[in-house]
Amino acid sequence: MSKEYFGTDGIRGRVGEGPITPEFMLKLGWAAGRVFRQEGRRNRVLIGKDTRISGYIFESALESGLAAAGVDVAMLGPMPTPAIAYLTRTFRACAGIVISASHNPFNDNGVKFFSAEGTKLPDSTEEQIEHFIRQPMEIVPSSQLGKAARFEDAKGRYIEFCKSTVPFHMSFAGMRVVLDCAQGATYQVAPSVFKELGAKVETIGVTPDGLNINHEIGSTHPDQLAAKVVEAGADLGIAFDGDGDRVVMVDHKGEIVDGDEILYIIARDKMRKGRLKGGVVGTLMTNFGAELAFGELGIPFERANVGDRYVMEALLRNDWCLGGEGSGHIVCLDRTTTGDGIISSLQVLAALSDLGITLHEAKKGMSKLPQHMINVRVSQKVDIKGHTTIQSAVANAEKQFAGKGRVLLRSSGTEPVIRVMAEGEDEAKVRSIVAELAKIVEGSV
């Protein structure tokens, strides 16, 4: 059954436009409550959010809907998305809800759900929720209405959990770190974690006003952090996105260290310690340089479709524990159940501390290959794999790389374009091949 509202990462859109309205959120809360309240038991659902001004409206609406279905609600306030996943498990809640649009601007918002195990809901549960969204709303008898409360110690619990992912004997004393919290959900938690582990911390992006989340700051805009790291003479910088499930880093020279490089550093350290279970999962967009670097280490590598949901599916299918995306979604299943920017960055700092090296030195084992991409607009959906002219051109381009590069054509899931991308050792050659392929695609669709 196809879903009307749920996408690959929950429900998301522009505030005030369906389905991101108070009316829909009320119904969504009720529908979810009907699904979560099984066998008449009074289950509890956690609600967290990022710092968007609209989060307060939707928090109230979801709370009302859940209570109307007879479900108790615990509201945690602004908290990173992965914190909700963790706390859902430790509080023994039946589900967790996050109100966030991740790295998007303040005028977008959305909702994502976590199961009792702290993982994303299966399709079958999302389909059940959509079924009840289409039904008339019926409130349980007054004696069965859910109760709502705010939990004040949630931040402290999550801070202690983050710290527990670093060896007990390890301290980051003497390490100078700049944190960019993107005016988002990590603005209180992240500084506390790194300070309590001994690091000297400077911060930017820790004064959210409900409107400035992700605005020219955070993991999608690391330039401000890079400048601050160099200016402060810091050892490194760490940038999160608005809801804290992504991380990008900056070395002491101001050079960006993206998700592919972070994934490589963590994988190499786990392998060195004998703790890497199986191989590593990347995506179709993971830089070819990462694939080559993993190969040199003898680490199996597999590509999944773009999106942390697909990375997770590949990890579970292979029974592996580490995967991620260039955008900074890093999943360490031996530490947590979802992408976690704070915990991923802690694994990097622990590796640096253990080896006594800088972030700049740690990333040297992987050389990113030049990458170029052109978006070709199309008027209708195109079967790329079944198009003989396009596939012939792709095969010819791959021959030119002779195993030292790759070509990728894929349709966007959000806009009417075909993304034509190539990577290789020679940047001029890469650009030439992409330009030629883009022309062929334009002339064939």
Curated annotation (Swiss-Prot):
UniProtKB keywords: Isomerase, Magnesium, Metal-binding, Phosphoprotein
Membrane-crossing segments per the record: none
Residues that bind Mg(2+): S102, D241, D243, D245
Protein name per the record: Phosphoglucosamine mutase
Modified residues (Phosphoserine): S102
Cofactor notes: Binds 1 Mg(2+) ion per subunit.
Keyword Metal-binding set for record: yes
The reaction(s) this protein catalyses: alpha-D-glucosamine 1-phosphate = D-glucosamine 6-phosphate
Membership in a protein family: Belongs to the phosphohexose mutase family.
Statement: the UniProt record of this protein carries the keyword Isomerase: yes
Annotated GO MF terms: magnesium ion binding; phosphoglucosamine mutase activity; phosphomannomutase activity
EC number: 5.4.2.10
Function as written in the Swiss-Prot or TrEMBL entry: Catalyzes the conversion of glucosamine-6-phosphate to glucosamine-1-phosphate.
A biological-process GO annotation: carbohydrate metabolic process
Post-translational modifications: Activated by phosphorylation.
Gene: glmM
Cofactor names: Mg(2+)
Superkingdom to which the source organism belongs: Bacteria
Pfam family, one: PGM_PMM_III
GO cellular component labels: cytosol
Gene3D superfamilies: Alpha-D-Glucose-1,6-Bisphosphate, subunit A, domain 3, Alpha-D-phosphohexomutase, C-terminal domain
Active-site residue numbers: S102 (phosphoserine intermediate)
Coiled coil: none
Top EC class for this record: isomerase
